[in-house]
Amino acid sequence: GKHCGNPYECGFLAYCQSQEPQAEQPIKWLPGRLSNGLQAHIDAHGLTELRDVPDELLNDKQQRVKAVTLSGKPYFDQRAAAQALAAYKLPAYFLDFETIQFAVPIWKGTRPYQQIPFQFSVHRLSRTGKLDQRAFLDVTGNDPSKAFAEALIAACGERGPIFVYNAGFETARIRDLSERFPRMAKSLLALNERVVDLLPVARDHYYHPSQQGSWSIKAVLPALCPDLDYGDLDGVQDGGMAMDAFLEALAPQTSKARKSEIEQQLLTYCALDTYAMVRLWSVFTGSALKI
């Protein structure tokens, strides 16, 4: 009932729901906030299946998700996706961060639960289609922030779009770094001015039934680029696992051999994140470059 999530979500909610009949295509796959009218209709009729929700109570994006889910046929407006990215010329950079946070800060100048970037990957795509990759990873146990900022500025050059997936995350980390290191602030904030978010392009112009209401890169990538699979990675396959691996690498009891193994797993995982963006960009733009 409503009390299960008010004022906070009950810790047993998942368990209780597991005892109930599971919807084949659940309403929770609908993106965005449900309108008051839609929620009232769902509650009044006890609806759980997406197919039973009236179209007239859905916004355009929700209608699209419902239609794709029921038909099993993906939606892709490639022309509109290409148009959205047409202004951004090569060379281009594709950037991803990995971060860690501590309830009790372990590094001077950081605050509780502050997202501290410890790793990045950057792929650079030239006008001729040449693809280069640069990476940063610090598992020494020292505060990685300053070295991270210096390496990031060097890796991203001075011109060309910097593509990310969910720009709010990377740009916020860059702002944090600019505040901590005023001497680098101008160069860091200049990076933010070049950031272009691929997430809205995916959200507005692409949807596959396998996404199940999510536009995370790990939901979109297997649909658009089935040859790439995070599940094939050894050890680190998502951001949460990257955090856990980083903490293990910092632990005093971790052997040198294990630490080296973790480093390689982290580098491989983050590199796939940025290569995935290159591939998404290629599909969205209809690029003829062989990447």
Specify the residue positions occupied by each region the protein language model found:
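Conserved DEDDh/DEDDy metal-dependent 3′-5′ exonuclease domain
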Residues: 133-241
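Active-site-proximal structural scaffolding
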Residues: 3, 9, 46, 74, ...
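Helix-hairpin-helix
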Residues: 21-67
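Residues lining hydrophobic/aromatic ligand-binding pockets adjacent to catalytic sites
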Residues: 72-79
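Short, flexible loop/turn elements at secondary-structure junctions
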Residues: 14, 97-101, 124-126, 140-141, ...
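Generic, well-ordered alpha-helical scaffold segments in large soluble proteins
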Residues: 41-44, 56, 88-91, 121-126, ...
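Acidic, Mg2+-coordinating catalytic module of metal-dependent nucleases/exonucleases
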Residues: 1-25, 41-44, 212, 220-291
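Conserved RNase H-like, two-metal-ion catalytic cores of nucleic-acid enzymes
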Residues: 79-158, 179
